[in-house]
Amino acid sequence: MSRYRGPRLKKIRRLGALPGLTRKTPKSGSNQKKKFHSGKKEQYRIRLQEKQKLRFHYGLTERQLLRYVHIAGKAKRSTGQVLLQLLEMRLDNILFRLGMASTIPGARQLVNHRHILVNGRIVDIPSFRCKPRDIITTKDNQRSKRLVQNSIASSDPGKLPKHLTVDTLQYKGLVKKILDRKWVGLKVNELLVVEY
């Protein structure tokens, strides 16, 4: 299954808030059909929704998510926590969390168009796995800096996770350590994703 490129608000209405997918929020009460579901949700449906939240928030294909679950399953620690750490340490997500891009698809485009340097080298792979003490900067040209400047100006500095630091004047970010579970910016039960 390929990456989702359709209407984003439909996914947000169904799955809840997905800050990595879009900044838009659906209007309350507009075109909301009354849904008559039984009181008890089916277990399969709950697990599927949790998996879809991860997929759409991080912009992954089905195969990529399966690969991350497989890697997390081999770890000796909690599989769900390792899965979230792997996803949060992707370069496109780090750019989004630093405020250098307004959404994860926007961050992916910055990386693909070679505007981003990691430790002084151009990286054009959005799934690049960042490590602690990695320094993420923009290319030293006006166009790259202007693209990032717009996002940094509109981002909220209070939402910056504790494992990252950002220097807004030099367009530079630093990964200090691996993320704790409580700083994940998405309400998801990762154990249900692993069970799926």
From Swiss-Prot:
Region (Disordered): 15-43
Name of the gene this protein is made from: rps4
InterPro entries registered for this protein in UniProt: Ribosomal_uS4, Ribosomal_uS4_bac-type, Ribosomal_uS4_CS, Ribosomal_uS4_N, S4_RNA-bd, S4_RNA-bd_sf
Family matches, as Pfam families: Ribosomal_S4 (PF00163), S4 (PF01479)
Taxonomic source organism: Setaria viridis
Chief location of this protein within or outside the cell: plastid
Keyword RNA-binding: yes
GO cellular component terms, A-Z: chloroplast; small ribosomal subunit
Function field: One of the primary rRNA binding proteins, it binds directly to 16S rRNA where it nucleates assembly of the body of the 30S subunit.
Name the UniProt record assigns to this protein: Small ribosomal subunit protein uS4c
